Design a protein with these regions (language model features):
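Polar low-complexity intrinsically disordered regions enriched in Ser/Thr and small residues
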Residues: 4, 11-19, 44, 146, ...
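Surface-exposed loop/turn and secondary-structure junction residues enriched for glycine/proline
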Residues: 85, 147, 152-154, 163, ...
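Catalytic core of non-heme Fe(II) oxygenases with the double-stranded beta-helix
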Residues: 173-307, 324
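Non-heme Fe(II)/2-oxoglutarate
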Residues: 89-183
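Fe(II)/2-oxoglutarate
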Residues: 1-108, 306-324
Length: 324
């Protein structure tokens, strides 16, 4: 992936200028495409990858606690109800508490207000402001959204890998056992998206490059519109769920700060137009090695048990799945 430090620029700019100063002097390509923009400006980002990596290190964090996953991170950022549910599941007491965290606003779409704390949202929003005001060029997060931050690119990859291993992957495997087994969500790609007037205001119907997606609304309140609309999935092809795979219905989900939504990546969806204000969300895609996205369902006897789901296996942060 392009997000690992490359040889290009790794030694820093000539003349002893700091990496941060050199990165701020770059003129990045302006993101324009609202569809198929995965490789927009590819040469620029490849050429300056090492320099940008060093610049983010030099900038440093605003909220250091966001950058290291562990007990302190969990206490501050993971909702107490999820911590309790995860502890019970790991102890072999089953997933009753974990399932009780969710409701199903649309068939096949699961929502919860009890995954992350208000401190997580506020600290991450503050970090995004710190990153956005840094002057360091930032690559578009995916092929459709033009504005956001690739979290694995700015130093957050280790903490996010810990979060995925401990909680996000087990929850995805619990909710979608027919798609997520031991090798189907070993890697992740984490980014934020921002919707506002003058930027991206909506997102066309699409499927994600993931087997399962976590989408957390950071806020802050005050926007209008911008619901997430899901479409009944069926048919064939890489980016659709086979009929009979699982319940995957149609309907709208209205975001509010703190609402997390988990859905199959191939459950087609769109972001409806934002009518006012601004909204930021953090999104984590889960997928297999080499960007593989499973769509063929496992038979019941092939699915993981609850105990197997909550045995953490280390994941890897990767670049955009289309580059793997």
């Amino acid at each position: 992936g392009l997000l690992a430090t490359s040889a290009a620029g790794a030694s820093g700019p000539a003349g002893g200028t700091s990496a941060l100063a050199a990165a701020r002097a770059l003129v990045p390509p302006v993101p324009k495409l609202q569809k198929g923009g995965e490789l927009e400006g590819f040469e620029f980002w490849e050429e300056h990858d090492g320099l940008l990596t060093e610049a983010w290190k030099e900038l440093g964090p605003r909220n250091e606690g966001l950058y290291e996953y562990g007990p302190a991170y969990e206490r501050r950022y993971v909702h107490a109800d999820l911590r309790q549910a995860a502890a019970a599941a790991r102890a072999g007491e089953g997933e009753r508490l974990a399932r009780a965290l969710f409701w199903e606003p649309v068939p096949g779409v699961f929502a919860s207000d009890r995954l992350f704390t208000e401190e997580f949202r506020e600290d991450l929003l503050g970090e995004l402001e710190h990153i956005s005001s840094s002057g360091i060029p930032r690559r578009r997060p995916n092929g459709m959204n033009r504005y956001g931050v690739i979290l694995d690119q700015v130093g957050l990859e280790a903490a996010l890998a810990g979060l995925v291993d401990a909680l996000v992957r087990p929850l995805a495997a619990m909710l979608f056992p027919e798609l997520v087994a031991a090798e189907d969500a070993t890697e992740h790609y984490a980014f934020t998206v921002r919707y506002e007037a003058g930027g991206d205001t909506e997102l066309a119907k699409h499927g994600d490059a993931s087997v399962a997606t976590l989408n957390l609304c950071l806020g802050r309140p005050g926007w209008r519109g911008g619901e997430l609309r899901f479409f009944e999935s069926g048919g064939s092809g890489m980016y659709t769920l086979p009929k009979g795979n699982a319940s995957a219905g149609a309907g709208d989900v209205a975001f509010h700060p703190g609402l997390a939504v988990l859905h199959r990546g191939q459950h087609k969806h769109q972001a409806l137009p934002l009518l006012g204000g601004e909204r930021s969300n953090v999104i984590i895609w889960l997928f297999a090695e080499h960007g593989v996205v499973r769509v063929a369902p496992y038979a019941p006897h092939e699915q993981l048990s609850a105990r197997q789901r909550w045995q953490a296996a280390p994941s890897k942060a990767k670049g955009q799945p289309w580059e793997l």
